[in-house]
Amino acid sequence: MPCLLPTLLRATRAALLLQSPRVVAAPASQRLLSAPAQPAASPSSMDSAEELLAPLRLAVRQQGDFVRKLKEDKAPQVDVDRAVAELKARKRVLEAKELALQPKDDIVDRAKMEDTLKRRFFYDQAFAIYGGVSGLYDFGPVGCALKNNIIQTWRQHFIQEEQILEIDCTMLTPEPVLKTSGHVDKFADFMVKDVKNGECFRADHLLKAHLQKLMSDKKCSAEKKSEMESVLAQLDNYGQQELADLFVNYNVKSPTTGNDLSPPVPFNLMFQTFIGPGGNMPGYLRPETAQGIFLNFKRLLEFNQGKLPFAAAQIGNSFRNEISPRSGLIRVREFTMAEIEHFVDPTEKDHPKFPSVADLYLYLYSAKAQVTGQSARKMRLGDAVEQGVINNSVLGYFIGRIYLYLTKVGISPDKLRFRQHMENEMAHYACDCWDAESKTSYGWIEIVGCADRSCYDLSCHARATKVPLVAEKPLKEPKTVNVVQFEPNKGAVGKAYKKDAKLVLEYLGACDECYITEMELLLSEKGEFTIETEGKTFQLTKDMVSVKRFQKTLHVEEVVPSVIEPSFGLGRIMYTILEHTFHVREGDEQRTFFSFPAVVAPFKCSVLPLSQNQEFMPFVKELSEALTRNGVSHKVDDSSGSIGRRYARTDEIGVAFGITIDFDTVNKTPHTATLRDRDSMRQIRAEVSELPSVVRDLANGNITWADVEARYPLFEGQETGKKETVEE
């Protein structure tokens, strides 16, 4: 297959140069204007693959240098934004090529996997007998058990290990809360609508599908194809009017009816409702679980005897009214989240348990690596914190714990990386942000976010409610501190806002240092800033307010905690586990299985009588009761069919181990049975009375299968390879 990506790069750059010839891309002497097309590298040739990637890496590095220079020269923001858009386009091209060059055996057979998931009812589209609703899914017995085990392991790994305070908040959220958090104003995508039947589409997704269809037409010229490739490369960067122009230029119609479409409009992704019968209290289904934790900060602080640091967590469903859900569990309208908010003194971001994860080696994709065209590299976590790649050891500790959790539940370490947000991606209040990303058949997808959110959330809610959300820190010795506060000109504020002046003054009096510093910067740059309180907006200028800095002596210090927030998308984690653990038995393409770690396997063990002979039934009953007493979830399969066929059935739903009762169990004393390992298909023989505790210890991770094989004799009977496989 010919390499079209250098062409895509040139086309992207050309389109952007038309918008801003001065600053979009690096100077011509530093650009790759004619990188030759080359055949794709064979999976066995890493050198050949790197040759293909080298010019793309160079293109990213040069543009990253150019963006940095623009910022150093204090170029106009519009020029910086355009140059950053070009940088992101080059990054996407590089990453697409990296994924295209991965070995074929590294890619899961998604069609075969999805067939297994549907056939064994892991999950299915909700309301299927009514035609289904996109973006909503029901979990079947196997999927429900797998999801619950993923959640239970999360609880043990984080809440119990870290002694985190778990809470459970309502999903219904009044509008003012989400207005304060920014969700009402900013939580939106652009949408277009069929003008005749009202069918809605997400604008960027529809434009992408339409352009790809045009490009696949044999009559499409190379020039036109390059133009459309450049549009696709910067699709995430278009605003409302730019999208509207593109829909007109490319004559985009409804894909289902061919009707005209409305211009793109912002669509808020939250589900709106009204609380109470009067309809006077608008609200929303929560888009995240975090806000409930922030609002209960004071109560949680009291519960923790007023001490920092402490952490709170919540597991629950959140809702986003996606315009066009797709990609199975990756983009849905209702999903389960698990979020931790770790509250810490901003001046003491050192975690006492960081040494326990400091020696972990994991793939880190730093912001610097991204703007210089490098790939993620394996790095010791302790070195990453010491060298400042990761901002502080609290953030580093949670990244390490996240890595251990994800690999524990079945995500491949080689398909897991932590990507740092680039400066233009991070919210203005964030200190550092890293996403855990997994490689799937859909490419790299975010499954966990881990951000140092500074003091932003608590400060916002404190200003809106005029309730101080702070912790008191006793000082060993009195100290003199610098104080920053607003100094309002009451006369000017009163003249401008009259009866609302009191609202403005109260708001300014409740602001913390973080916010004041941000607004001070706006005052110096623009001469004004805007505040919002009790549903009203006020513009304040230099003659109305200034910033006063002075010193005072304190015996007790008030601290607005910084927040480290790990946020887990459990549906995406579950989907990644499904892909990373799906296998086809060597030599038998029809025999598939999931190699779930025992800790999350839907059933830890199966109990399988060799046949339906009634002599086996007392032992089936005895083992089932003993497994239940040991807390081992299990499945009894006493159906007809060969033992090999039943092994295949239990393997297909990821049952970790299998106990088989045969005639030796009945006829010999002491009574013994076989225990089979799903992944290796090897078996041992042990006394029936011992097996439940052995399976329990395997499921809890106290022992490994290697330990079991060292302790008990191997058995080779029920599954002897080729003959049994043929029978199945």
From Swiss-Prot:
It is found in: Cytoplasm; Mitochondrion; Cell projection, Axon; Secreted. The modification Phosphothreonine is found at residue 725. GO terms for molecular function: ATP binding; ATP:ATP adenylyltransferase activity; bis(5'-nucleosyl)-tetraphosphatase (asymmetrical) activity; glycine-tRNA ligase activity; identical protein binding; protein dimerization activity. Its EC number is 6.1.1.14, 2.7.7.-. Homodimer. This is Glycine--tRNA ligase. GO terms for biological process: diadenosine tetraphosphate biosynthetic process; glycyl-tRNA aminoacylation; mitochondrial glycyl-tRNA aminoacylation; tRNA aminoacylation for protein translation. Residues 52-108 form the WHEP-TRS domain. Catalyzes the ATP-dependent ligation of glycine to the 3'-end of its cognate tRNA, via the formation of an aminoacyl-adenylate intermediate (Gly-AMP). Also produces diadenosine tetraphosphate (Ap4A), a universal pleiotropic signaling molecule needed for cell regulation pathways, by direct condensation of 2 ATPs. Thereby, may play a special role in Ap4A homeostasis. It comes from Rattus norvegicus. GO terms for cellular component: axon; cytoplasm; extracellular exosome; mitochondrion; secretory granule. SMART domains: WHEP-TRS. The gene is Gars1. Residues 1-32 form a transit peptide. Glycine binds at residues 288, 339, 565-567. CDD domains: GlyRS-like_core, GlyRS_anticodon, GlyRS_RNA. It holds the Pfam family tRNA-synt_2b. The modification Phosphoserine is found at residue 689. Belongs to the class-II aminoacyl-tRNA synthetase family. Keywords: Acetylation, Aminoacyl-tRNA synthetase, ATP-binding, Cell projection, Cytoplasm, Hydrolase, Ligase, Mitochondrion, Nucleotide-binding, Phosphoprotein, Protein biosynthesis, Secreted, Transferase, Transit peptide. Its main location: cytoplasm.
